[in-house]
Regions:
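Acidic/histidine-rich, metal-coordinating catalytic segments
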Residues: 142, 151-162
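Electropositive, glycine- and tryptophan-enriched low-complexity nucleic-acid-binding patches
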Residues: 89-151
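Short, amphipathic alpha-helical "recognition" segments used to contact nucleic acids or chromatin
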Residues: 1-8
């Protein structure tokens, strides 16, 4: 509950924390860091999504899968919790390679009838994502959304410039 309040309104959370015993921001961040979220399509996200979707009425299951790519500053980081270096290309969500990434591709699903949204997956790549990789990821994500009980009506792409296959 504290996480939901904190994400909805930081100011509101601070005000309520003066009245109620709510966890600190540090505690919330420590709890979030325990959730195993890695680049690619994550079972944790889709398992939780399926649980939530099972309680929705039929019209609330209509949704759009959205994706967009953004540039990043190339950077390598040691994740102390996993003892792995991060910042490398992971654009074929099954593989990681030694190329330093400078772009992130993010997938999200959003309700069309009811106003809800959920991040689904992300990958890192060098330059823009190649079209063959995007098709593979998009197919996998739409399939997983349908398996979770969602009714994907359309896809929406941001201003992504996709590389053609070489």
């Amino acid at each position: 509950m504290g996480l939901i309040l904190h994400k909805q309104s930081g100011r509101g959370y601070r005000a309520l924390s003066k009245i109620f015993a709510l966890p600190s921001k540090k505690t919330i961040m420590q709890l979030l860091n325990r959730i195993p979220i890695n680049p690619g399509v994550n079972d944790v996200i889709f398992n939780n999504l399926a649980e939530v979707v099972s309680g929705l009425d039929e019209s609330s299951k209509y949704c759009a899968v959205m994706f967009d790519e953004m540039s990043l500053d190339p950077h390598i980081h040691l994740n102390v919790a996993t003892k792995e270096f991060e910042g490398f290309e992971t654009n074929d969500d099954e593989q990681r390679n030694a190329v330093i990434a400078d772009h992130a591709l993010v997938f999200m699903v959003r309700g069309l009838v009811k106003n809800w949204k959920q991040p689904l997956a992300y990958t890192f790549c060098r330059s823009s994502t190649k079209s063959v990789i995007l098709v593979r990821l998009l197919t996998k994500i739409i399939t997983r959304c349908q398996q979770a009980g969602l009714k994907v009506i359309c896809t929406i792409c941001g201003n992504t410039c996709i590389q053609e296959s070489h």
